[in-house]
């Protein structure tokens, strides 16, 4: 039986990948937008993004996406937009198999534990390969950037040093800046 990529519950006979309500929650539309790419054309797309100097920082490969609205009878389509997209897509990697599925499952487990998480889901490339997608919470619906700080900024580190730290350093930052450090 087919399962919803957002909530993992069974789909009705005519639904594909998402319940209408689940699609509305993550994408804002009753029908999920089409992701018109395949893993094979990702390298070309990545080169274009790098040439435009609009890459997203981090360890894992990712692309910034936005939705081009479809007509009344057509679903929307995701397009790669550099830094200003409202979604982040993380595809499969050759080095670590099933990383998108693991990240989505981890987020679901966090939700079950009553930890607030960003809106997230799995989604399929045109060829059926699963990717992880998350809606950015640092952007308005119009795409304007919202100010947010991360541990790199709080620790006054350069972006290049973002992943050179320890849990102890993070704990000290939480103690320093939090009004409820034992809860944070």
Regions picked out by a protein language model, each given a short descriptive name:
Residues 157-184:
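Helix-hairpin-helix/helix-loop-helix acidic hairpins
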Residues 2, 21, 32, 46, ...:
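A sequence-composition feature that detects small, non-aromatic residues
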Residues 1-43:
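Regulatory N- and C-terminal appendages and interdomain linkers associated
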Residues 6-8, 37, 87, 132, ...:
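Sequence-level detector for tyrosine residue identity
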Residues 23-27, 31, 35, 43, ...:
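Generic detector of well-ordered alpha-helical segments enriched in charged/polar residues
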Residues 42-164:
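Conserved ATP-binding subdomain of kinase catalytic cores across diverse folds
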């Amino acid at each position: 039986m087919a399962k919803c990529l957002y909530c993992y519950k069974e789909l009705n006979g005519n639904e594909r990948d998402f319940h209408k309500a689940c699609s509305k929650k993550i994408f804002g539309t009753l029908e999920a937008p089409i992701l018109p790419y395949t893993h094979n054309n990702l390298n070309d797309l990545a080169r274009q993004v790098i040439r435009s100097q609009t890459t997203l920082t981090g360890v894992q490969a990712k692309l910034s996406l936005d939705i081009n609205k479809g007509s009344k009878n057509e679903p929307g389509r995701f397009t790669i937009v550099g830094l200003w997209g409202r979604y982040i897509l993380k595809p499969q990697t050759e080095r670590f198999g099933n990383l998108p599925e693991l990240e989505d499952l981890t987020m679901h487990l966090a939700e079950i534990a009553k930890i607030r998480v960003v809106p997230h889901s799995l989604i399929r490339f045109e060829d059926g390969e699963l990717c992880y997608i998350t809606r950015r919470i640092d952007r308005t619906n119009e795409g304007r950037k919202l100010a947010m700080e991360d541990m790199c900024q709080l620790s006054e580190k350069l972006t290049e040093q973002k992943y050179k730290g320890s849990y102890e350093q993070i704990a000290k930052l939480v103690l320093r800046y939090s009004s409820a450090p034992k809860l944070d």
